[in-house]
Amino acid sequence: MAQVEYRGTGRRKNSVARVRLVPGEGNITVNERDVREYLPFESLILDLNQPFDVTETKGNYDVLVNVHGGGFTGQAQAIRHGIARALLEADPEYRGSLKRAGLLTRDPRMKERKKPGLKKARRSPQFSKR
């Protein structure tokens, strides 16, 4: 008999997370490492668990994540987005609560490109009067 699993893809900035939810005890594995070993800050782990708190499914699923690109914050938010999408696939009833919490919306903010003649995206070179 095939094991039931739900998949979701989450994105944020330059991070892409492929998430699989499998019925279990609530273990979270990121890139084949424990989440507490992979993410350095407790606040990111709390952020990542938000979809489970909203849907009251904490401890019902094991989470297997493959994530690449970006930094810790972007990756944590991409994982959160992927978990929310996978939960929606598991039970469409969760759509209302996930939508109200803003967890199904892909955050479109990206790093602004550097322009020629400027030091950064908007920072101009220092002006010297003389």
Curated annotation (Swiss-Prot):
Record GO terms (molecular function): RNA binding; structural constituent of ribosome
Similarity comment text for this entry: Belongs to the universal ribosomal protein uS9 family.
Region Disordered, residue ranges: 98-130
Organism: Staphylococcus haemolyticus (strain JCSC1435)
Name this protein carries in UniProt: Small ribosomal subunit protein uS9
Keywords: Ribonucleoprotein, Ribosomal protein
Pfam families from the UniProt entry: Ribosomal_S9
GO BP: translation
Tagged with keyword ATP-binding: no
Entries under PROSITE patterns matching the protein: RIBOSOMAL_S9
GO cellular component terms, A-Z: cytosolic small ribosomal subunit
InterPro entries found in the cross-reference section: Ribosomal_Su5_D2-typ_SF, Ribosomal_uS9, Ribosomal_uS9_bac/plastid, Ribosomal_uS9_CS, Ribsml_uS5_D2-typ_fold_subgr
Composition-biased stretches (Basic residues): 111-130
